[in-house]
């Protein structure tokens, strides 16, 4: 199932630990504090447990959304890059 993990974590070290966990589970960074990818239900639970351990003792808001393939394929994406220099 397609998953989206988003988070708001003020502590730099805890935030990096969450990013590392998402990467360890094969998710791709789609924004600074957002990762997406395909995870089984078992891996969803395991990742969320790992994230919970990594943010222990820190302020954190972490959300994991699960989408069926139809909903995921219907999403709209706008990505632009400019040379803002």
From Swiss-Prot:
The keyword Ribonucleoprotein does not apply. Its EC number is 3.1.-.-. GO terms for molecular function: metal ion binding; RNA endonuclease activity. InterPro entries: CRISPR_associated_Cas2, Virulence_VapD/CRISPR_Cas2. Pfam families: CRISPR_Cas2 (PF09827). Its cofactor is Mg(2+). GO terms for biological process: defense response to virus; maintenance of CRISPR repeat elements. Mg(2+) binds at residue 8. Signal peptide: none annotated. It comes from the Bacteria. Keywords: Antiviral defense, Endonuclease, Hydrolase, Magnesium, Metal-binding, Nuclease. The keyword Hydrolase applies. CRISPR (clustered regularly interspaced short palindromic repeat), is an adaptive immune system that provides protection against mobile genetic elements (viruses, transposable elements and conjugative plasmids). CRISPR clusters contain sequences complementary to antecedent mobile elements and target invading nucleic acids. CRISPR clusters are transcribed and processed into CRISPR RNA (crRNA). Functions as a ssRNA-specific endoribonuclease. Involved in the integration of spacer DNA into the CRISPR cassette. Homodimer, forms a heterotetramer with a Cas1 homodimer. PANTHER family: CRISPR-ASSOCIATED ENDORIBONUCLEASE CAS2 (PTHR34405), CRISPR-ASSOCIATED ENDORIBONUCLEASE CAS2 3 (PTHR34405:SF3). Belongs to the CRISPR-associated endoribonuclease Cas2 protein family. NCBIfam families: cas2. This is CRISPR-associated endoribonuclease Cas2 2.
């Amino acid at each position: 199932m397609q998953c989206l993990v988003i988070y708001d974590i003020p502590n730099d070290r805890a935030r990096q630990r969450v990013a590392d966990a998402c990467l360890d589970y094969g998710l791709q960074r789609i924004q600074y504090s957002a990762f997406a990818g395909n995870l089984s239900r078992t891996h969803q639970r395991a990742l969320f447990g790992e994230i919970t351990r990594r943010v222990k003792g820190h302020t954190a808001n972490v959300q994991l959304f699960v989408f069926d393939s139809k909903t995921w394929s219907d999403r709209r994406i706008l990505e632009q890059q400019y040379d803002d220099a």
